[in-house]
């Protein structure tokens, strides 16, 4: 029996397509509603006093919602198969660490980070970064023992580390663990803490709601002066 939530799949697909679109469109020649509301064209300088919201502001929250809404399907299915909470937490932490590495790795290999203006070397390194991601995150569709698949992944991570440590960057920049893609880093946090919240409140919706209300109170109250 197919228990997929097609509406959730559709929302996730829409969010991915529009995230790619919003990151690649030439916003300098398009109207303001094609950019973030607080970073209007042509300069795209952040101005928090500007009111409003555009579709560009909504696509990433849509993806986060779809990701969180999928937890009962992915985690719940594994729990029904008998996986312990410890194993579920391990998988969540592993996924979060992988996403964190991904966020750091790709941020260091944007062409504009490698050289200014961009040259052939920068684009070739960016393409190499893209190529290394495949053995890092996909399972090679060949019949091999598990140790071979693991070895390929470890080798890919090793190549990525060597690339980050030995590459020279534009404007005197050097490798830094704090230089990362904030969007992917948010997904990594969601993968760890969102999964952990669901795992420990899987059978108690009221406890989950209480934790969410507590988080909401902390977020809303952080800017209140004493």
Positions of PLM-derived features:
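Alpha-helical transmembrane segments and their immediate juxtamembrane cytosolic regions
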Residues: 1-226
């Amino acid at each position: 029996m197919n228990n997929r939530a097609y509406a959730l799949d559709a929302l996730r697909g829409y969010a991915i397509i529009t995230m790619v679109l919003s990151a690649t469109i030439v916003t300098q020649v398009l109207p303001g509603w094609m950019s973030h509301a607080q970073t209007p064209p042509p300069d795209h300088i952040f101005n928090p006093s500007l009111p409003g919201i555009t579709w560009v502001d909504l696509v990433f929250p849509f993806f986060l919602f779809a990701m969180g809404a999928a937890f009962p399907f992915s985690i719940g299915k594994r729990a029904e198969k008998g996986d312990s909470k410890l194993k579920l937490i391990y998988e969540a932490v592993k996924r979060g660490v992988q996403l964190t590495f991904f966020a750091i790795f790709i941020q260091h290999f944007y062409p504009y980070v490698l050289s200014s203006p961009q040259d052939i070397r920068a684009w070739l390194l960016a393409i190499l970064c893209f190529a290394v991601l495949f053995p890092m995150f996909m399972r090679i569709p060949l019949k091999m023992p598990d140790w071979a698949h693991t070895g390929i992944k470890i080798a890919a991570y090793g190549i990525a580390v060597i690339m980050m440590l030995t590459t020279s960057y534009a404007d005197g920049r050097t490798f830094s663990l704090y230089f990362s893609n904030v969007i992917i880093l948010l997904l990594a946090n969601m993968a760890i803490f969102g999964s952990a919240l669901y795992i420990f409140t899987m059978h108690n919706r009221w406890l989950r709601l209480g934790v969410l209300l507590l988080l909401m109170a902390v977020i809303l109250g952080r800017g209140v002066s004493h």
